[in-house]
Amino acid sequence: MIARLAGRIAEKRDDHAIVDVGGVGYLVHLSQLSLASLPPPGEPAALRVYTHVREDALDLYGFATEDEEAVFRALIDVKGVGPRAAQNILSGIEARELAQAVAQGDVARLTKVQGIGKKTAERLVLELKEKLVALARAAGPARAGAEADVLEQLRTALLNLGYRPPQAEGVAEALRDSAEGRPLDELLREALKLLRG
C-alpha cells in the first residue's frame, strides 16, 4: 500500500496531479485545497496518500496535510460516502472546519458544501462527532487564526497555480472586504473567476 509520494509535480489538472517519482508518473486525486497548495509543475513535492483498491482499479488520493487525510479517512467510514465523494467534500470545506461543524452538530453549515444534503449532513454528525472532536478542538472556537491569514493563503494558492505575484496580490486585495469568515476554497473559486475574466 502506498502511503506517501515524494517527487516532482509533472502535471496539475482540475481534480488530480501527476507526481513523477523516479521516472514513474503517479496519478493522485486531490481536493481543490490540496491541489492549490502544490507547487507548479517541475517543482518537488511530497504528499500523504490513501490507496484505494477496487476489483478493477487502484486509485491514489493525496493530501497536503495530516488533518485532511484524517478527515478523509473518517469520511469514507460513513455509509454512502466513498473516496470520490469524500474528496469532493474536502474540496468544499477545509478539514478542520468540517471537523468543527460536525463536532458542533452544525447541519446548516455542512449542507452549504456541494455534495452534502441534509440527510448526509445528519449522518456525518451522528457517525463522526466523537471521531473528529479532537481535530475540532484544535481548530479553535472561532477559527480566528485561519480568518486572519486567509488572504495570505489565497495569495500563496494563486502563486502555486502559476499566477504572477501582481495578479495574486490584485485579486486578494479585490476580495479583502468580502474575505472575513469565508473559507479559503470559496475565496479561491471567486478569485479564479475574476482572473479568468
From Swiss-Prot:
Biological process per Gene Ontology, one example term: DNA recombination
Return the annotated region ranges for Domain II.
65-141
Mind listing the UniProt keywords for this protein, alphabetically?
A: Cytoplasm, DNA damage, DNA recombination, DNA repair, DNA-binding
Segments for region (Flexible linker):
141-145
Q: Which SUPFAM superfamilies match?
A: DNA helicase RuvA subunit, C-terminal domain, Nucleic acid-binding proteins, RuvA domain 2-like
Outline the segment boundaries, as ranges, of region: Domain I: 1-64
Please provide, in alphabetical order, the Gene Ontology terms of the cellular component aspect for this entry: cytoplasm; Holliday junction helicase complex; Holliday junction resolvase complex
Q: Indicate the segments annotated as coiled coil, or none if absent.
A: none
| Membrane-spanning segments | none
Region entry Domain III, spans: 146-197
Pfam families, per database record: HHH_5, RuvA_C, RuvA_N
Mostly located where?
cytoplasm
- Database matches in SMART domains: HhH1
Cellular compartments annotated: Cytoplasm
What GO MF annotations does this protein's record show?
A: ATP binding; four-way junction DNA binding; four-way junction helicase activity
The free-text domain remark for this protein reads: Has three domains with a flexible linker between the domains II and III and assumes an 'L' shape. Domain III is highly mobile and contacts RuvB.
Q: Which family does it belong to?
A: Belongs to the RuvA family.
Which HAMAP family has this protein been placed in? Answer: DNA_HJ_migration_RuvA
The entry describes its oligomerization and partners as: Homotetramer. Forms an RuvA(8)-RuvB(12)-Holliday junction (HJ) complex. HJ DNA is sandwiched between 2 RuvA tetramers; dsDNA enters through RuvA and exits via RuvB. An RuvB hexamer assembles on each DNA strand where it exits the tetramer. Each RuvB hexamer is contacted by two RuvA subunits (via domain III) on 2 adjacent RuvB subunits; this complex drives branch migration. In the full resolvosome a probable DNA-RuvA(4)-RuvB(12)-RuvC(2) complex forms which resolves the HJ.
NCBIfam families, per database record: ruvA
Q: What is this protein called?
A: Holliday junction branch migration complex subunit RuvA
Supply the source organism for this entry. Answer: Anaeromyxobacter dehalogenans (strain 2CP-1 / ATCC BAA-258)
